[in-house]
Amino acid sequence: MAKNGLVIYILVITLLLDQTSCHASKFKARKHSKRRVKEKDGDLKTQVEKLWREVNALKEMQALQTVCLRGTKFHKKCYLAAEGLKHFHEANEDCISKGGTLVVPRSADEINALRDYGKRSLPGVNDFWLGINDMVAEGKFVDINGLAISFLNWDQAQPNGGKRENCALFSQSAQGKWSDEACHSSKRYICEFTIPQ
């Protein structure tokens, strides 16, 4: 009987060990399956994020094409004349809300392109805002992003406003020369949009 009890005991232990190893392998399989699901979930999230970036880039391109169709294109920029009069900060905020900035000419060719576009799109307008100012340091004119301006096209005796006139204007009557003006003056303006590569 003791022998039978030992055999039964060994059988029970064997069955328990078999069940335990079966549960352990099922647990490992579930754990591995969960890891694969998490990996796939991460891959899907990455793909969705990539698709959103592509969709947003396409939306930006479409918006830029609309701007270029309504305005004019010059090299890697589009210009769009805005409606109404605004002071410098309002004009810049309006351009930013459209995805651009106030125009900043960086060459004589760009001055000529702006003169031509300004005559066509802003008939009768003598001057308009540029995205150039010296609000931070008197006499040190920078663009909207705070970068120093390397190309300058000031009219004779300009800038002359000292601390009262810190924002730059493009003058049609002075053949595209610049002058400084009080930033709170209301003027017309042109927004520029950079065309991505």
From Swiss-Prot:
Keyword Disulfide bond: yes
Positions of disulphide bridges: 68-78, 95-191, 167-183
Main location class: secreted
InterPro entries in alphabetical order: C-type_lectin-like, C-type_lectin-like/link_sf, C-type_lectin_CS, CLec_Tetranectin-domain, CTDL_fold
Coiled-coil residue spans: none
A GO biological process held by the record: ossification
Secretion signal span: 1-24
Role this protein plays: Promotes cell adhesion to laminin and fibronectin.
Name of this protein: C-type lectin domain family 3 member A
Organism: Bos taurus
